[in-house]
Swiss-Prot record:
Record carries keyword RNA-binding: yes
Descriptive protein name: Large ribosomal subunit protein uL2
Biological processes annotated in GO: cytoplasmic translation
Assembly information from the UniProt record: Part of the 50S ribosomal subunit. Forms a bridge to the 30S subunit in the 70S ribosome.
Residue ranges that the Swiss-Prot or TrEMBL entry lists as coiled coil: none
GO MF term (any one): structural constituent of ribosome
Taxonomic path: Bacteria, Bacillati, Bacillota, Clostridia, Eubacteriales
Segment forming the signal sequence: none
One Pfam family named in its UniProt record: Ribosomal_L2_C
Native organism: Desulfitobacterium hafniense (strain DSM 10664 / DCB-2)
SMART domains assigned to the protein according to its UniProt record, in alphabetical order: Ribosomal_L2, Ribosomal_L2_C
Role, per record: One of the primary rRNA binding proteins. Required for association of the 30S and 50S subunits to form the 70S ribosome, for tRNA binding and peptide bond formation. It has been suggested to have peptidyltransferase activity; this is somewhat controversial. Makes several contacts with the 16S rRNA in the 70S ribosome.
Example of a GO cellular component annotation carried by this entry: large ribosomal subunit
Biased composition (Basic residues): 257-276
Length: 276
């Protein structure tokens, strides 16, 4: 969807850009596909803070998205393209010919009235989902499973796409949006095409209050806190950290790697992503 700017009537409007929502065809969601979504504000089931800078924001309902696409050989008509407050991509409402309804991620180019289908015999066209073993090398994919039948976990955000680079034995090699080359099982399912809402990356929040509407709280540097609030805090005026950078709880921070060295999925990574 294109983005539009504003005349600088106020400092907050000067840099702000918003989506025009031209692709959205329906403004009210399908009630049968909604679920309650309680605000967690970054807390776990013990009430302890586990993710900083979250809280507030507008109330939301969760849209139940079909990430498995396992309703094989039943054609579905795209009834509408809708906004989803829980993700950067838009979603498409499908009406299956047997009466079932479902939401999927809306790929770029998907139109209302178009027919999509999933299954091993599906055609190679945008919106169809099928096992990777039945997809030609070089095809752009999104909504990709990491384990057969588990549901899609890779390439789900706006504008994302992976390219199928090779198929050898039981595994296929994909080039992910990060540049990482990764192997996945050829029985894993993927959807043809690129995730829609390509202009999402060009949206400028413009002002602090708009971040608060989205449930994002301010990020305060430890160096400007008091020593009882953060290990970097304290001192007269500005001071160097004086130690290796750490989180408020003393764990390594600011560039420290957090991925487990013995992560079981390491063996499926052919080439790590490059530095930005």
């Amino acid at each position: 969807m294109p983005v539009k700017g504003f005349k600088p009537y106020s400092p907050g409007r000067r840099q702000m850009t918003v989506s025009t929502f031209e692709e959205i065809t329906k403004t009210t969601p399908e009630r049968s596909l909604l679920a309650p979504l309680k605000s967690k504000a970054g807390r776990n089931n013990q009430g302890k803070l586990t993710v900083r800078h979250q809280g507030g924001g507008h109330k939301r309902k969760y849209r139940l998205i079909d990430f498995k696409r396992n309703k094989d050989s039943v054609p579905a008509k795209v009834a509408s393209i809708e906004y989803d407050p829980n993700r950067s991509a838009n979603i498409a409402l499908l009406h299956y010919l047997d009466g079932h309804k479902a939401y999927i991620l809306a790929p770029n180019g998907l139109q209302v009235g178009q027919m999509v289908v999933s299954g091993p015999d599906a055609d190679i066209k945008v919106g169809n989902a099928l096992p990777i073993k039945n997809i030609p090398v070089g095809t752009l994919l999104h909504n990709i499973e990491m384990k057969p039948g588990k549901g899609a976990q890779l390439v789900r955000s706006a504008g994302g796409s992976a390219q199928l680079m090779a198929k050898e034995g039981k595994y296929a090699t994909l080039r992910l949006p990060s540049g990482e080359m990764r192997m996945v099982h050829i029985d894993c399912r993927a959807t043809i095409g690129q995730v829609g809402n390509l202009e999402h990356e060009n949206i400028n929040i413009g002002k602090a209050g708009r971040s608060r509407w989205l449930g994002i709280r301010p990020t305060v540097r430890g160096a400007v806190m008091n020593p009882n609030d953060h290990p970097h805090g304290g001192g007269e005026g500005r001071n160097p950290i004086g130690r290796n950078p750490v989180t408020p709880w003393g764990k390594p921070a600011l560039g420290a790697k957090t991925r487990k060295k013995k992560n079981p999925s390491n063996r499926f990574i052919v080439k790590r992503r490059g530095k930005k």
